[in-house]
Amino acid sequence: MSYYDIIFSKHIDKIKSEGRYREFKALKRQADNFPFAEHANKQIVMWCINDYLGMSKHAKVMHASIDALLKYGVGSGGTRNIGGNNIAILELEKELANLHKKQAALVFTSGFVANDTTLASLAKIMPDIVFFSDELNHASIIAGITSSRAEKYIYRHLDVKHLEELLQSVDINRPKIVVFESAYSMDGFFSPIKDIINLAKKYNALTFIDEVHTVGLYGKQGGGIAELLNCSDQIDIIQGTLAKAYGTIGGYITSNHNLVDAIRLTAPGFIFTTSLPPVISTAATHSIRHLKESNEERIKHQEVVTKLKNSFERFNIPYLKNESHIVPIIIGDPIKTAKASNMLLNEYGIYVQHINFPTVPRGTERLRIIPTPAHTDKMINDLSVALVQIFAELDIELSSAKELNEEVRLNLIA
């Protein structure tokens, strides 16, 4: 083993010893049988997929993508500046701007890139800018702010009082921006959006909201929590993804013409990469259009979320209580959490990926349950029964787990 192999091997061994080694599951998704998949030649039920509404297999979306594939081919042919600025992606951006009631939109290869390169670019455009960021913001937000090398203040999670204290400390005439998420993916809590908007206005700050876990799911047309609260027009930059509720891939920002154009001309994550293929852009556009017109998926989704939480209450299964569609079960032990996940998959045919550090803080390791409109009452009951049996086998005390979940909840909303 070479000198460098030893370094890498030690790094891997350390992660394994901490119980947070990640193994990919080889899955064969079944487009005609969502939310089922095949794993190790067995049919399983997926309970952790971010294809929130099953739009990846929706007939309109698949047929549109097939038509685009035959018409345009597989790839986009280049960057947006050199050959890759196709009609399909322009239509997608127009649809996104309309969704969020903004003047313009810009599409990126992923939600991560959209956050990372946009935030870093804002600091290039405004070198004196100050970032104010929620302490539990996504890694992509942290990466963008960090790489910007701009001055930053981190406010306590969801704590608008602390945010105001920090805003007060900076000259009101200095460029500043508050960056936050509408719904936090690991805990499921919503941000106090209107309070943040009011503070930003009071202290002359821009607002940047990450709506990746809410677009398509909330609001009359699927415009996210900002649309639900009727405040999209009061937020300067709305960022979202095409890879979750819309069932495709890609990320985007929406804002006014000048801001979007400035990012288009500045962001390396936009300029120096191949654009989304027309087949993806077309599929995303049709997915957005369908969810603008149809509320059926959202209604059914919320019904299943409620049924799942009610089932957990009946079975005395501890979970982190919130108002969103994300249902975390905090176990607090990386080894037991991984074992519970593997037992669900191998013994019960239920796939729930365990979430360990660094995705969540140590001591809050969890299973994160993601309901979809396609999950049935039987699937909910099977999951509940399996969890009770696995908790007993792993000596996970329900009372202790309940206390841990409540402790985490109180810490998050304190």
UniProtKB/Swiss-Prot annotation:
One example GO MF annotation: 5-aminolevulinate synthase activity
Pfam families assigned: Aminotran_1_2
SUPFAM superfamilies named among the record's database cross-references: PLP-dependent transferases
Residue numbers annotated as active site: 244
GO biological process terms held by the UniProt record: protoporphyrinogen IX biosynthetic process
Acyltransferase keyword on record: yes
Cofactor(s) listed: pyridoxal 5'-phosphate
Record-listed E.C. numbers: 2.3.1.37
Keyword Transferase: yes
PANTHER family: 2-AMINO-3-KETOBUTYRATE COENZYME A LIGASE, MITOCHONDRIAL, CLASS II AMINOTRANSFERASE/8-AMINO-7-OXONONANOATE SYNTHASE
Family in the record: Belongs to the class-II pyridoxal-phosphate-dependent aminotransferase family.
Name of the protein this chain belongs to: 5-aminolevulinate synthase
